[in-house]
Amino acid sequence: DYEATISPIPCTQQLSMYKAMGALGFDAGTLGNHEFNYGLPFLNQVLGGGLDVDGVDPTKKCAGAGYPAVLANVYSSKTKKPLVQPYTLLERTVVAKGTDGKEVKLPIKIGVIGFTTPGIMNWDKRYLEGKVYTEGAVESATKYVPELRAKGADIVVALLHGGLDSAAYSPTMENPGLHLSKVAGIDAMVMGHQHGVFPDTAATPSFNLPGVDHKAGTVNGVPAVMASSWGKALGVVQLALQWDGAKWVVNKAASKSELRNIQSKNAAGANVYVEPDATIAALIETQHQAAIKYVKTPIG
């Protein structure tokens, strides 16, 4: 809010959140509903430009996120094309051990595709109506996941700003993760929006739904995570990969996921927290203190 409306950042400056994510080495990300809260011109600015919609200059070049922002199910009403790139294909190197026990280095292509909740059309109607429209996550995935595979993706990771709901599927449903996991070709899901936890190790876990396995950390056999909210946890998906001599194959039965919380308890029962990263704190300290000063402003 502060960097969007109170003290708007210039085109040449990254959002503080993007600075932190850059320091952490994010490879890709998607958009949640709150990214649309400040209108499309501001979104265009903080993403670095390129949004071809009415009322926005797509040629405007700004600092941007610093990593590929992907979103497959929001389209420009003007162009009938995705508002931003629906997916990205990351080329990395895997260091593994061969059958002889020796270390080998092999290339791997990782497809990352993003989806947000169609609720943006209601919550930010004043900014979005007539300028963009949404598609169901399942429909978008069915369209674009095969494209990623055709371009050589060894694995496909779905970034879903949505969660789990056992209701019958609808293209407008807010939390379609249970249904998205059934789309062929998706190897892992990173979920959000509901501010819940998955997998949940509690005695009575949340998301106690058909097809959901908290012990394995899978949704319909697909490894998945939902890391609470506000940085309270880190979601970790561990995919078991096997090289068949020509390509990588995901062994889903041997894959798993987990959450690593920033807060735990020591032997005495006192709260223990992960140590803050001084590098990141220094990157955003000026804006952080300015925001604190603003929220302490008396209003009456």
Where are these regions (language model features)?
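Acidic, metal/ion-coordinating pockets
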Residues: 1-259
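Hard-cation-handling environments
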Residues: 228, 237, 246-300
